[in-house]
Amino acid sequence: LQVKHAKVWTLRSMIRTDILLRAIPWAKLILRTRTAPGTLNLRPAQRWSVALTGIALALAVASPVAPFLLLPAGAALIGILALNASFYRFLCEVRGIPFALAGVFLHLLYFTCCGLGAAWTLLGGGGDLERKGV
């Protein structure tokens, strides 16, 4: 049996889904139960990737006033690439370098969404944003 998934994904819908329907509910669940269920993708490499993505973004944003911050931002990015090298290598082997580069970008975007959802929840947000039209 073969079926076609007919959902149309845009970058906006992916970001919205990753934050509102994944990151925030997972963060709420972890805070409520004080444990990370084994079914969630929360291996140490992924946790480090989210943290390093946040660090890299914060340093990059601050770099116009302190250009020396680009060096540690680059180091954080290299750390993310190293932590996920086997996945990126797989993307390259399956579909080539352009596909792998797009995969790296989307993976970084995913880590950013995870971090934003977790931060939002930890800061007391995470209410029912879906109903509010966010």
Walk through the language-model features, giving the residues of each:
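Short, hydrophobic secondary-structure boundary micro-motifs
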Residues: 5-6, 38-42, 100-101, 131-132
